[in-house]
Amino acid sequence: MKTNELKRLVARKVVDYINPGSVIGIGTGSTVSYFIEVLSTIKNLISGAVSSSNFSTACLKRIGIPIYDLSKINSLVLYIDSADEINPQLQMIKGGGAALTREKIIAATAEKFICIADESKQVEILGKVPLPIEIIPMARSYISNEIIKIGGMPKYRKNVITDNGNVIIDVFNLVITDPVCLENKINSFPGVVSVGLFATRKADIALIGTSSGVQVIY
């Protein structure tokens, strides 16, 4: 099966985990876009959504899904998002779409976090893809130097401003053997808004699209 077909497969499967009438959190990315397509055919299943990005918000509004402000709802039962990489412990690298900070906030709020991805995103050790860091613009040089000290190769993501008005540094050349430790270390640098390691708050369930069907990992 082609990658896009695998993404559609998990996008359809995750519907089984939605409580009818609930407000759900929705992330950002190509696999999530397929999930939003699925929602367009069953939009009465949910009451509305909390969105992690302006892009996803626009897509959801286009199909008539009400958008809720996270700060104005009492609880969020479910958050559905994709990943750039995911390891066997369900820790992830996310942020290729520059929405990592809002994704982290929604993930931290949700009772359950389901990651939907195709099998190409599975790795034993995180770090094959660059690790995004959202930073305050004036901290760019400082944080780049700190990243070099820990063995990373920082690269400024040109022509990208996040929905929060910040910039992104992508970090190459990392072999992330202790994701929680690295997440905490990078978050401690002044000027870091958020790092795209989802290790402390990892996924609760992963639905992985494979050529033999959907693999469910807890």
Curated annotation (Swiss-Prot):
One of its GO terms (molecular function) is ribose-5-phosphate isomerase activity. Keywords: Isomerase. Substrate binds at T28, G29, S30, T31, D81, S82, A83, D84, K94, G95, G96, G97, K121. The keyword Lyase does not apply. Its EC number is 5.3.1.6. It catalyses: aldehydo-D-ribose 5-phosphate = D-ribulose 5-phosphate. Disulfide bonds: none annotated. The keyword Isomerase applies. It comes from the Bacteria. The active site is at E103. Pathway: Carbohydrate degradation; pentose phosphate pathway; D-ribose 5-phosphate from D-ribulose 5-phosphate (non-oxidative stage): step 1/1. One of its GO terms (biological process) is pentose-phosphate shunt, non-oxidative branch. Homodimer. This is Ribose-5-phosphate isomerase A. It comes from Buchnera aphidicola subsp. Baizongia pistaciae (strain Bp). The gene is rpiA.
